[in-house]
Amino acid sequence: MNSLFTSAFSPLAVSLGLLLVMTSAFPTPGPLGEDFKNDTTPSRLLLTTPEKTEALIKHIVDKISAIRKEICEKNDECENSKETLAENKLKLPKMEEKDGCFQSGFNQAICLIKTTAGLLEYQIYLDFLQNEFEGNQETVMELQSSIRTLIQILKEKIAGLITTPATNTDMLEKMQSSNEWVKNAKVIIILRSLENFLQFSLRAIRMK
């Protein structure tokens, strides 16, 4: 009787075993950017590939686009705010020839250092964005979280060659404005500049 029972269920047991192995080997993929949420431990970051880092940057750019779109739905002139850049005196980090991120004179090491330092400088402007943006705060918080994760990944690559700058609360106060149009213009300029900054960094990120 025991022999018959064993022989009858052996194929089922083997099939279940194979199914478990296949499930472990091919996990269900999550949405873009999910791998980077709530996990910035050193061991996790060391396993990050250039492809995953590039995917994270594209995820950040998508969040930037979503915020810009939300603002523009309420303000028809939101994308025509370039002329206010000089007036608002926003000293936003931007790439220059010496930073090694352009095709001409490209230098991966220098570009990674500039990218990391620039993103750290952008933190004060992202704080302004969070304080002034009246739309979906969850999107803004996710943007900030993703950028912090990217900074940690880049710090691993450059082996701590830069330090985190002190928070400039005076600058944050100077950026405040009671004028709704000027406030929205500043937010749009910050988002546009951040997106351009990230696009220039991609060449260094893609290289292994």
Swiss-Prot record:
Got any disulfides in this one, which pairs?
72-78, 101-111
Q: Where is the signal peptide?
A: 1-29
Its keywords, alphabetically, are: Acute phase, Cytokine, Disulfide bond, Glycoprotein, Growth factor, Phosphoprotein, Secreted, Signal
The terms under GO molecular function for this entry are: cytokine activity; growth factor activity; interleukin-6 receptor binding
Phosphoprotein as a keyword of this entry, yes or no, is yes
- GO cellular component term, pick one: interleukin-6 receptor complex
Q: Which domain of life is it from?
A: Eukaryota
Where it sits in the cell: the answer is: Secreted
- Acyltransferase as a keyword of this entry, yes or no, is no
Record SUPFAM superfamilies: 4-helical cytokines
Q: Which InterPro entries match?
A: 4_helix_cytokine-like_core (IPR009079), IL-6-like (IPR003574), IL-6/GCSF/MGF (IPR030474), IL6/GCSF/MGF_CS (IPR030473)
Q: Which GO terms describe its biological process?
A: acute-phase response; glucose homeostasis; hepatocyte proliferation; interleukin-6-mediated signaling pathway; liver regeneration; positive regulation of multicellular organismal process; positive regulation of receptor signaling pathway via JAK-STAT; positive regulation of receptor signaling pathway via STAT
Q: Which residues are glycosylated?
A: 38
Residues with PTM Phosphoserine? 81
Family the UniProt entry places it in: Belongs to the IL-6 superfamily.
Task: Quote the subunit structure annotation.
Answer: Component of a hexamer of two molecules each of IL6, IL6R and IL6ST; first binds to IL6R to associate with the signaling subunit IL6ST. Interacts with IL6R (via the N-terminal ectodomain); this interaction may be affected by IL6R-binding with SORL1, hence decreasing IL6 cis signaling. Interacts with SORL1 (via the N-terminal ectodomain); this interaction leads to IL6 internalization and lysosomal degradation. May form a trimeric complex with the soluble SORL1 ectodomain and soluble IL6R receptor; this interaction might stabilize circulating IL6, hence promoting IL6 trans signaling.
Chain's role? Cytokine with a wide variety of biological functions in immunity, tissue regeneration, and metabolism. Binds to IL6R, then the complex associates to the signaling subunit IL6ST/gp130 to trigger the intracellular IL6-signaling pathway. The interaction with the membrane-bound IL6R and IL6ST stimulates 'classic signaling', whereas the binding of IL6 and soluble IL6R to IL6ST stimulates 'trans-signaling'. Alternatively, 'cluster signaling' occurs when membrane-bound IL6:IL6R complexes on transmitter cells activate IL6ST receptors on neighboring receiver cells.
Could you identify this protein by its name? Answer: Interleukin-6
